[in-house]
Amino acid sequence: MSEQRLKNFKVLTRCLHRFELFKKKDGSRVFSLTLANLSPELLRQIEDFLTDEKAIFLRYPEIYEQFPYSAKIAVKTPKRKRPPILDDEGNEVPKGMPKPRGQNTVADLLTRLRAFILWAIDNGYTTNNPFKHFSIGEIVYGTPIYISNEERNKLLETDLSDDKEVETQRDIFVFQCLVGCRVSDLYKMTYRSIINGAVEYIPRKTKEDRPITVRVPLNDTALKLIAKYQDYSRDMLFPFNTEQNYNRKIKIAFQRAGLDRIVTVLDQQTRQEVQRPLYEVASSHMARRTFIGNIYKKVKDPNLVGALSGHKEGSKAFARYRDIDEEMKKELIGFLD
């Protein structure tokens, strides 16, 4: 089992432990979640539990002390006291409080549980399959939101010298836009990853299932960003921060660069389309989408783009990038004149 799959199953295991403790505290003191008693009704309860763990946390915070919502290992950075995280109303968010899960995330967790149940049946641990009479919600994605090369350059050229931390995370984001890797692979890059003018890495997500080396040539901008932060005593390619802080600083950098065009995104909790300014939806994964989207617009060859992004041949991910962009739409309408 790959490292990423193992991590995902550990997340599921903690969720099920918390659900079991919740049931015990909510009136069923002798409740025990087993392969034998798992039923469609229990699956519906688990689905509801996964959808809104925040409410459970506020009622029974002790459950989350025993089985934390998150067990992330942060990138090592100098210790300093961080300001508390505030919600939209300015109230301090209790440490360890779960974030609302989207329907895709809940469906993904239930799909992993179903895979485990089917494995248990195949290996003789149970004959009970509650998923025969339980339907997992469909995983739905919206159109990928990414920035144009012009917007990326505007972001890079924005003067952020008054806030070095935002400037640094902005520069890392732009570098990620130029190499297209996932943030987990970015954080593992060192100076040894640079070979003959290109960055080489084995995507962590597919390392054990399909260990291929991805090689992405570095353009002048990428090489200048590496040189700007060159520090061989650090070993890591850039002064990385936690992914949470990285995403927070990216949003600030976008806003300061005036990247505020309105985009339509899919609210994963309600599955409704909502309009939001670009800087609000900016995140580390937008860098990967930017790399893929801008190249795919030019070549329209998923296998060629996949050789640079690490996607396997025939990946369904590229189907989401096939929407005709605005410039092409205008050109097509021009044919009617």
Where are these regions (language model features)?
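N-terminal core-binding DNA-recognition domain of tyrosine recombinases/integrases
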Residues: 1-4, 13-143, 158-161
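Short, charged phosphate-coordinating catalytic segments
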Residues: 117-129, 176-198
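Conserved tyrosine-mediated DNA breakage-rejoining catalytic core shared by Y-recombinases
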Residues: 135-136, 179, 188-227
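DNA/chromatin major-groove-contacting recognition/catalytic segments
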Residues: 154-155, 214-224, 228, 319-337
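Conserved catalytic core of the tyrosine transesterase superfamily
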Residues: 160-174
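Short, basic (Lys/Arg/His-rich) helix/loop patches that form interaction surfaces
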Residues: 161-163, 231-236, 251-307, 311
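A short, basic/aromatic helix-end/turn motif that makes direct DNA contacts
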Residues: 188-194, 296-298, 306-313, 320-324
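Catalytic-site neighborhood detector that most strongly recognizes the C-terminal catalytic loop/helix
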Residues: 205-207, 243-246, 309-335
